[in-house]
């Protein structure tokens, strides 16, 4: 179906087309107090060609299209420096340094299921930093996987990047709204470490029933550790989660647990993973380095 969603692609290899888009979008942004724009990309390029080019130059079209797109983005983001623009990887596959130059964050995937996102975000983080990955809590049952994942785990999964929500809050219970408040408060506490710290992958979802990662703040004083178990196992043995990149001679306080462990203990013995019941369960720890 070349008419995806009844959409066609404008020929951005043509200057007049770029001029039209720049002015049209600028008028909209000037018409209201707009602070955030999601720049979606959902149409594949098919039957690529341009009326602007001769027959022997038609193979230049895709390249010139991207140059035109960069020009559009350069002009619009320069005109509106206080607007946060978010690009989209779903459909257009444009999660790349070229787009990130103009739009500092990208919607990591149109797949918003929290469990599917574990692999998506884990893989994306191999190339792009967490601050650039749009990661949102979505409604359940998930509209794609039809999976019901606990709100806590949806939150932990989304806090692996640029955190937000992708749901209708008017349909949430009062209890869920309170949990959202707690999640937002928590993310504000850990945001600097998540977005500007160093990411370490502890367990991969590609070869394990578990996934875990940790972020260490720039000053090495704060640590955020996230853990998700995908499916429950009968008679599963107790296990620890070994951390990395800590100061072995320093002590770390586990916030909220009244526990202090040395860096040596955390790296060679690990954090005790508590008893977790059911599928799609999670745990997030905050650690703070203590002054000696």
PLM features: residue spans?
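An active-site-proximal structural segment forming one wall of the substrate-binding cleft
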Residues: 14-40
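Short acidic/histidine-rich active-site segments
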Residues: 35-47, 87-95
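Alpha-helix capping and helix-loop boundary segments enriched in small/acidic/polar residues
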Residues: 8-12, 16, 56-67, 145
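Short, small-residue-biased leader/transition segments that mark boundaries at the very start
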Residues: 2-3
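C-terminal beta-strand-rich structural cap/linker in extracellular carbohydrate-active enzymes
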Residues: 261-292
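Active-site-proximal substrate-binding groove within the catalytic cores of carbohydrate-active enzymes
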Residues: 70-258, 275-277
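Short loop/turn motifs at secondary-structure junctions
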Residues: 32-35, 79, 84, 281
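Conserved N-terminal phosphate-binding loop of PLP-dependent enzymes in the Aspartate aminotransferase
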Residues: 49-52
